[in-house]
Amino acid sequence: MTRKYFGTDGIRGRVGEAPITPEFVIHLGYSAGKVLTSSDWHLSKGERPAVLIGKDTRISGYMLESALQAGLSAAGVDVLLSGPMPTPAVAYLTRALRLQAGIVISASHNPFEDNGIKFFSALGAKLPDATEQEIEAGLNAPLKAMPSAQLGKARRVNDARGRYIEFCKSTFPNHLDLRGLRVVVDCAHGATYQIAGPVLHELGAEVVAIGIHPDGLNINHECGATHGAALQEAVRHHRADIGVALDGDGDRVIMTDGEGMLYDGDQLIYLVAKHRKQNGLLKGGVAGTLMTNLAIENGLKKLDIPFARANVGDRYVLELLQIKNWQLGGEGSGHIICLDKHTTGDGIISALQVLYAMRDSGKTLTELASDVTLYPQQLINVRVPKGFDAHNSLAIKTAQAEAERDLDTTGRVLLRASGTEPLIRVMVEGESGQKVKHWAEKIAEVVRNAAAGERSVEKALPN
């Protein structure tokens, strides 16, 4: 059974347009509540299931939170409200408070006009596909509230922020601190705005916090992990030792050194893996994605660290880690998963693992990263007819084979279809920037011509 609403990261869309409407979200809460109350959650007789709702700082969060709460309450589920809270914090608190599920209202790194809803299980992991399908199956059922005595209650979790701050700090070794470090942290006017700074400060750092004035409309706007320029400028202006930028819901991180040089998720994973390997702390290998820079794979090989690629998306990285029984993985966008520290990707905790490597080794971020330089990489998006399959084109196959022969072991070619738009993404990377540019443009042109030919055939066909 295919899912209509749930994607790889919950349900997401433009606010006010289906499915991100108050009416839909009430039904979503009700259906999710009915699934919870009908499942075997090992509850005592008469005990109601309880769910935590967290959100980021989008103005639409108030509306969607109320709708979700109403639907859950109508189904007989108690609701705990955390207010603005990072996605990984909701995953942690769901486990820590022994709740039946956690729900996050967020569209992550997207602009404020978008929003979304994602679910966590009692174990702090994303819901199994089967459970999401069960929730979807109940969306069209009539909303019939429980008798008044059985309606769910709601309350605020006033210590949610403090609990999560302490959890983050617990992932940093007790024998080390951040005294003497000036750290700029960019919270993207998002869910970490009252959390990331205190975590770093309580570990001893001198903290300069930016992106901490959310107004409901400015989340991710020219700041945070998707706009590193704001962090670079602040690090240089304040003469900081290091910079940390998170996205709107706190599950992504990028960093800068004291010169303002940006380090993406690929590089940060490499640094953490290298430190763990050198100290006998690395279990297994590292999971990346199809887009992980080849220089990272080659660098890990030199350190005798196994590496494997998953499809793009932190959900698939997590699945690969679980299959291989490894602990460390992620992607260049800044989703980093440390399964020995948390059940899901966590921007703050990932940054702390990099800071741990710095403090433990006595080296700066620049020094730690000096042995690996990312290969030039070019990505070109080519618009194609819906359903176009690049792998069926002999011309495209020939061009790709020619590029791979020329690049040999010093480069890589990847063609993949977008999961959301009618696009073929042409990615070429390698040691030679000149070769990368040449082959990316050549293959993209071949794809355009093949797609144009298919359009011509479509037009020639009778209606």
UniProtKB/Swiss-Prot annotation:
Gene: glmM
One term of GO molecular function: magnesium ion binding
SUPFAM superfamilies noted in UniProt: Phosphoglucomutase, C-terminal domain, Phosphoglucomutase, first 3 domains
Residues the record lists as Phosphoserine modifications: 108
Keyword vocabulary terms for this entry: Isomerase, Magnesium, Metal-binding, Phosphoprotein
Source superkingdom: Bacteria
HAMAP family for the chain: GlmM_B
Protein's name according to its UniProt entry: Phosphoglucosamine mutase
Annotated Gene3D superfamilies: Alpha-D-Glucose-1,6-Bisphosphate, subunit A, domain 3, Alpha-D-phosphohexomutase, C-terminal domain
A GO CC term assigned to this protein in UniProt: cytosol
Annotated active site: 108 (phosphoserine intermediate)
Essential cofactor(s): Mg(2+)
EC assignment: 5.4.2.10
Enzyme class: isomerase
Keyword Magnesium: yes
Annotated cofactor note: Binds 1 Mg(2+) ion per subunit.
